[in-house]
Amino acid sequence: MSPKAVVFAYHDIGCVGLQALLGAGYEIAAVFTHADDPKEKTFFGSVAQLCARHGIPVHAPEDPNHPLWVERIDKLAPDFIFSFYYRQLLGDPLLACAKKGALNLHGSLLPRYRGRAPANWVLVNGESETGVTLHQMVKRADAGPIVAQQRVSISSTDTALTLHGKLREAAADLLSETLPLLALGQLSGTPQDETRASCFGRRTPADGLIDWSLPATQLYNLIRAVTQPYPGAFCAVGENKLIVWAASAEAGNNGEAPGTVISHDPLRIACGEGSLVINAGQRGDNGLYLSGAQLAREFGLVEGSQLLDTEKRRPARRTRVLILGVNGFIGNHLSERLLQDDRYDIYGMDIGSDAIERLRTKPNFHFIEGDISIHTEWIEYHIKKCDVVLPLVAIATPIEYTRNPLRVFELDFEENLKIVRYCVKYNKRVIFPSTSEVYGMCQDASFNEDTSNLIVGPINKQRWIYSVSKQLLDRVIWAYGQKGLQFTLFRPFNWMGPRLDRLDSARIGSSRAITQLILHLVEGTPIRLVDGGAQKRCFTDVADGIEALARIIENRDGCCNGQIINIGNPDNEASIRQLGEELLRQFEAHPLRGNFPPFAGFREVESQSFYGKGYQDVSHRKPSIDNARQLIGWTPGIELSETIGKTLDFFLREAMAEKADMR
């Protein structure tokens, strides 16, 4: 009996995949594709037309993961599900419909170049080899075990179009070899080496902007990566646009500044290293395809001309970022990161300034001490004045959720709602700190921003008031987004690092877990493990988290507009007990260890006695970070032990300073 397949396919590779399945004797029960985008140049074959010629049922749903489609696919009882250049991720319920496996064909040699547009990216980066990979599908994009690969060499003259042709041939060869073996159950997968993984996001036309300060070879690679049928690399000549379709790199730039015309026939431009000869291009989006020499005449370029637009000649205005809660953990680290380059002016408000004293002398840092519930006129004025608003003020410690639930609601929801409405009023971009807490008691193995259910406990468990306050604001912001509000929601997962909070906060129970544990070590009291400390969390170094947040603020090509992004480290999962044990190990080895009492042991306590009757806990909280990888090219890299060490060192030095002050 022929194996039955359901296929998700688009592009030439989609056609190749379908033809290979038919050639291998597979029964294709249904095909899912995309309707062509009228704004996109469709230089590739049509999956829908191929299906029509073969009488194969074809569909183009907006959401293939909708339960109705999953139910229909499940009824087809496919042995296999295949994805060939289909542009949407397929969820676990859909993948589970395949009795023998779900496989994807990806256009690179995985684990390198996961994500979008791998053929373009390998050219941009000057690679000499790529390939195609058939791999098992898992929830995380392009991360499943590898079934088969075929290598493709990249020549120095390849363009995106010629490389695509090579990949198409390689895909046909790979599938013709592997599909019969797959049907016989003779192929298995090899896990990917995560240490070699790289991930790239989608490319947009704006990514084709030519920066003449770069080496000529790098610009040549960019041009061939995005030349026709893609939108092309471009630069400005005065107020006009020059699209470069063909070029070559040469050594030497005659000592000229980047962007200077060295000669007009051939049209040769000085680069940061070497020079670029423009062989062909066009003027504007609707111009004729012209030689470089004719382009020089059309633009009036002569030796010594500068390819700089009028905007580049003006000093760029810094982006004005308003941070409410600037003295807090995220606020002070974020300010420090943004002030490291000269693109931002930071305006901040908070009720204290101890964590930002080191920043107050910076010329681009502007601080006022104030309360967001009182200084509303200052806040409204600065929202109107600034470009980006981050309302970071919140009560975010679990004991306060049960101890002061109304105060949590008033501050975390009501005061922040006012700020959101000011952003709507003045059409300002808001980057709102949602929270991993919104996932509540979700049972997914990892929490996905777009598909995971947000589940909380009964009303008498006041612990959830923080979660639902944040969730409701997420929903309000999303609704305003449908009316034009520019926004991004980010969800931090257990960020840790220096200046997390204060030992004094831990003394009254109002601090994060690691600060409580360190306080016990400092004071020689037993480390209290709530419900045995079996709860697992994924801890994220603040430096990793802030880098992701900085990229969200940068928002290159609008990639983060209207998005929800988890920022966490799924590889740094540990139970609270394991966190305490690692803290103890590093504490005993720390140079300051001799200044503190002996370790008093671990003590298990019941959660209601520690937090109160309104508390309820969750067993795990692990983020999916596919959105962060694909939208902002972010992957965390700092191991948990390093983060624990930095955090411990900060608090031990704080404790020593307290002792010195008491003398």
Swiss-Prot record:
Lineage top rank: taxon: Bacteria
Enzyme Commission number, as recorded: 2.1.2.13, 1.1.1.305
GO annotation terms (biological process): lipid A biosynthetic process; lipopolysaccharide biosynthetic process; response to antibiotic
GO molecular function annotation: carboxy-lyase activity; UDP-4-amino-4-deoxy-L-arabinose formyltransferase activity; UDP-glucuronate dehydrogenase activity
Record-annotated active site: 106, 437, 621
Residues flagged as site, Raises pKa of active site His: 142
Subunit structure: Homohexamer, formed by a dimer of trimers.
UniProt family annotation: In the N-terminal section; belongs to the Fmt family. UDP-L-Ara4N formyltransferase subfamily.
Protein name in the entry: Bifunctional polymyxin resistance protein ArnA
Species assigned in the record: Pseudomonas savastanoi pv. phaseolicola (strain 1448A / Race 6) (Pseudomonas syringae pv. phaseolicola (strain 1448A / Race 6))
